From Swiss-Prot:
Keyword entries, A-Z: Ribonucleoprotein, Ribosomal protein, RNA-binding, rRNA-binding
Pfam families in the record: Ribosomal_L2 (PF00181), Ribosomal_L2_C (PF03947)
Biological processes, Gene Ontology terms: cytoplasmic translation
UniProt GO cellular component terms: large ribosomal subunit
Annotated PROSITE patterns: RIBOSOMAL_L2
Role summary: One of the primary rRNA binding proteins. Required for association of the 30S and 50S subunits to form the 70S ribosome, for tRNA binding and peptide bond formation. It has been suggested to have peptidyltransferase activity; this is somewhat controversial. Makes several contacts with the 16S rRNA in the 70S ribosome.
Segments for region (Disordered): 37-59, 219-283
Biased composition (Basic residues): 256-269
Entry protein name: Large ribosomal subunit protein uL2
UniProt subunit comment: Part of the 50S ribosomal subunit. Forms a bridge to the 30S subunit in the 70S ribosome.
């Protein structure tokens, strides 16, 4: 997908801005009204009004697009891609598809799909074609997949962002699981009846985007981040001191005093640990 670098730099704020030329890919259709829902902003606050997630607030108004992550309601029915649209709630694009029976839904757009293409979802083996959805056991080794379920029937949870994918490595010795190599290089087992979509998630050039100025970040609903070393000691463990002082501890800390950076956070007692063959950071 072509990226668009700003040539007419009217001010220094957009001197390094790089954006995506959406006109080459997206259609101009208005969103399907029946598949929109209200999205309330919480600005990172909980029900008591306390900040639980920092750096959230403001930004443009959004409506939530209801995405079909399960793709199991209309098995073996051909669906026609009607439009490819921008979704402000995610980095990948979404496609409006219309089934033979008139039902419409949004799905994540696979890379390379176009308006007028046909996609199918099934619980059985079907053509290995970009956009088709089926259980992992029917997809051959080496195939790139995205929109992957972790629990059969729950809906996709893995490889949903722009350019994300996993590679099928084959069945394990029991024949009950399929081994997948995720984008993080982690190798993990998935139940063979978990569904996945063939192909790579759309908008693969998303990682090349440079926002260029602080105002664009604010439009996204992200507020500024203040360095801990610029705070007072009562606000952050890194705060205080004369001038530019070092951390003064054995390791960097979070604002709440816990060790930060390079600390393992996964609980090895989780039952799913036995499904991980190789951790993402193992050599």
């Amino acid at each position: 997908m072509p990226v668009k670098k700003i040539v007419n730099r009217s001010n220094s704020g957009i001197h390094h801005k790089i954006s995506i030329d959406y006109s080459k890919v997206l259609t101009t259709n208005t969103p399907q009204k029946s598949l929109l829902a209200k999205k309330k902003k919480n600005s990172g606050r909980n029900n008591q009004g306390k900040i639980t997630v920092r750096h959230r607030g403001g930004g443009s108004k959004r409506k939530y697009r209801i995405i079909d992550f399960k793709r199991n309601l209309h098995d073996d029915k051909i669906a026609l891609v009607k439009s490819i649209e921008y979704d402000p709630n995610r980095s990948a694009f979404i496609s409006l598809i219309a089934y033979e029976n008139g039902y419409r839904s949004y799905i994540l757009t696979p890379q390379g799909i176009k308006v007028g293409d046909k996609v199918v979802s099934s619980s059985q083996a079907i053509d290995i074609k970009v956009g088709n959805c089926m259980p992992l056991e029917f997809i051959p080794e080496g195939t790139m997949v995205h929109n992957i379920e972790m629990t059969p029937g729950k809906g996709a949870q893995i490889a949903r962002s722009a350019g994300a994918y996993a590679q099928i490595l084959g069945k394990d010795d029991t024949g009950k699981y399929i081994n997948l190599k995720l984008g993080s290089k982690e190798v993990r087992k998935f139940l063979k009846n978990c569904r996945a979509v063939v192909g790579i998630a759309s908008n693969v050039d998303h990682n090349l985007v440079l926002l260029g100025k602080a105002g664009t970040t604010r439009h996204k609903g992200i507020r500024p981040t203040v360095r801990g070393s610029a705070m007072n000691p009562n606000d952050h463990p890194h705060g205080g001191g004369e001038g530019r002082s070092p951390v003064g501890r054995d390791a960097p800390r979070t604002p709440w005093g816990k060790r930060h950076m390079g600390v393992k956070t996964r609980n090895n007692k989780k039952s799913s640990t036995q499904l991980i063959i190789r951790r993402r950071n193992s050599k």
